[in-house]
Amino acid sequence: MKTQRFLLLILFTALLLVFTGCSQSPEAKESPKEKAQTQKVSSASASKKNDLPTIKILATGGTIAGKSKTSTTEYKAGVVGVESLIEAVPEMKDIANVSGEQVVNVGSTNIDNKTLLKLGKRVSKLLSSKDVNGIVVTHGTDTLEETAYFLNLTVKSDKPIVVVGSMRPSTAISADGPSNLYNAVKVAGAHEAKGKGTLVVLNDRIASARYVTKTNTTATDTFKSEEMGYIGTIADDIYFHNEITRKHTKDSEFSISSLDKLPQVDILYGYQNDGSYLFDAAVKAGAKGIVFAGSGNGSLSDAAEKGAVRAVKKGVTVVRSTRTGDGVVTSNGDYVKNDLLASNSLNPQKARILLMLALTKTDDPRKIQDYFNEY
Ligand code: ASP
């Protein structure tokens, strides 16, 4: 009898243990704090796909963030925020983990040196994190090449940096922004895009910031790299077909980490009957450097040359570029003797970017000419 009661007790205890063990869920065994952490981790891992690259989109405004009724020329640039840009292209989530930051929201004619420095520092900071694989900057097309070249010279990273814009506002029929943005994210997440410096992606083409320029006021195929060529194409897949021969990004000598301003560099344009007073006015207004968009191979009229030489004598660095839109400006003759430097193949607006950065390091004309030959 005693043994029977003892066996029954053991059976009852065993049943109780089994029952309580089964009914207790794993969560019930955790403290509320642990439970919250578990949920957070699992919800994060549900939305984040670990095998996809992590891309940050830094938005600055422009037509890609513009709105109109249906017009492609009358619209307000820089009104749509970065979250709306991302929401408009949900397909991006299949190719990358994307998130956005609004740096500024302006038409690109209002991008100034302060914004360049802010953007450059932010891109550098983000890329220094092991959690970020690439950066996309959305930007107005008017001065896009200047910002792209600035990043090309100042961000010390070999991770992809892609600058993108659009020629039609987000509300236009057949807006080009969504597909350009999708392609930009695709390129920024591509392993093959590493080490190529800052890239510009529009209209299914990949261009180097060093070589590309805007060539047409309104057409969607406005960004061209006539002389040097595009470096790649996007036809669903990415096809790279050219290498960059100029120094950039992690091989660049220019650093902005401790800068809060850039030296004033102005651009003057050469034309028939121009005068030397243009140079005097720039010097008086505080220019430390002047880029001259000369005719042909960076030529100056006699009057302009007098003004340029006067500026050089006052310690201002003068660089000859060209208004032709393409080709190399060579160092030759009296121009060299008078320390009028040559922009090599940089157009005036990009020569200004390089000259600003060069002047943060030196005012030696020979050294600055070397920079123009190397970058
Ligand atoms: N005006 C515009 C801008 O540069 C043009 C564009 O984005 O295409 O912001």
Where are the regions a protein language model picked out?
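ATP/NTP phosphate-donor binding region
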Residues: 34-35, 39-124, 306
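ATP/nucleoside-binding phosphotransfer catalytic cores, i.e., glycine-rich phosphate-binding loops
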Residues: 43-44, 49, 277, 302-375
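Short, acidic/small-residue loops that bind anionic groups at enzyme active sites
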Residues: 148-178, 185-189, 313-322
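Accessory alpha-helical/coil subdomains and C-terminal extensions
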Residues: 52, 58, 65-68, 81, ...
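Short Gly/Thr/Asp-enriched flexible loops that form oxyanion-binding sites at enzyme active sites
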Residues: 137-159, 300-309
